[in-house]
Amino acid sequence: MCEIIGRKKEIAELKRCYESGRAEFVAVYGRRRVGKTFLIDEVFHDDMVFHHTGLSPYDRRRKVTLKDQLQNFYFSLLRHGMEDIAQPKSWMEAFFLLERFLETCDNGSRQVVFIDELPWMDTARSGFLTALEAFWNGWGNMRHQLLLVVCGSATSWMLDNLINNKGGLYGRLTGEIKLSPFTLKECEEFYQSRGIRMSRYNIMQAYMIMGGIPFYMNFFNPSYSLAQNIDALFFSRNAKLGDEFERLFNSVFDHAEDCMKIIRFLGTRHSGFTRKEIAERTGLNPNGDFTKMLKALMGSDFVVKYTPFGFSQREEHYKLIDSFCWFWLHFKEKKAVKQNDYWQQHLKESDVASWRGIAFEEVCLQHISQIKYALQIGAVSSQESSLIVKGSEEADGMQIDLRIERADDAVNVCEMKFYKAPYVVTKGYAQVLDSRLQALEEKNPAKTFLLTYVGNSDLVSNEYSDIFKASVTLDDLFV
């Protein structure tokens, strides 16, 4: 096994299942390109007796059919040593062939069976799930040496059909792993392992573009600067990620075009929109399929649902949180350019500065535990949210980037700033912050509000900087 960056908890769970001495059924899911296949291959490389990957539904020419999936499964069995017999005509037959094959190569040691991109195999009216249920309930769970690992990027399918299954597979999983993108610290370790020298300032910017997805980071050229790498990946002719946005959605979501329509609309406002606003502005019918699409986008960590502080439950907002999508929509798609040095030429433009502010906030929201650790409140129970206060005739509205409401009745009100140079608090800005504090204290007199600076650069000490009672800077986010 080669060196694996991070993933310590996930590796420990996989090893626990391997060493249990009983039949194990493990589901691994997470965003596409996050490294699920790599993890399983590396951990179980020497013990895998069968490995199969479903065919991607992303085919520009035609839909992938049940016949295609069955033929592909049959060929995988042959490649692993099954005797050459008739090709199965149904999933029931296919899984029966897998049973027979595993019995013939059973030598008493652990048998690891890895089925990758499981949701792709479940084509319309194929009977796939019923056959999988029969395979496990009727045979697999009685084989003490069997370790079945299934993977899927279509997170909503994995959640609905395996993890939260209400039918024959209810409660059958013995292990469940959701694989998340790398943290900033893990990204730093990844780049170092590839011989890529980057400052933490640039690692942060890379994260703001690609969101800690190792598949994208793997394309980096060590001899290029960050800006050169971004041009090579996104903007040059034959860019490696030139069609990644559509490929990503078409390979994961059933209603890919409508899901992309939702994502494009959510990308127009950082704070997000209500369900009603999304339906009205996209022209989509707010029916059951619409609900499933929103659920699928949330399950795959592209979108989050939240109720802004001060709003009613009926005003729940849906917000785009995927860094890659933010960058793609604002630059790759919006600009529609094929210029080899586009990013290098436009780094100092105002729209890039505006995007950086939003993108930095999203990275911080993905590193809440690091922020809490830096504030020495890691062990304190808390709830995190943004804060939007509606304006009225009597008072102005306000928006706060991050609010950490703690069990000890203190609230960290976080202001996030992305500046290359050390940040200087001006007299005018200090007055704005002070008025916000007073408004919050009037509404919540039992709480103690602590203004907290979260930035990639240091906070300059001056006569106004003590408005902030705590600060979190770039190095704190790399813990």
List the model feature ranges, each with a label.
Residues F309, E316-V479:
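A cross-kingdom feature that marks ATP-driven nucleic-acid transaction machinery
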Residues M1-H346, S350:
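Phosphate-binding site recognition
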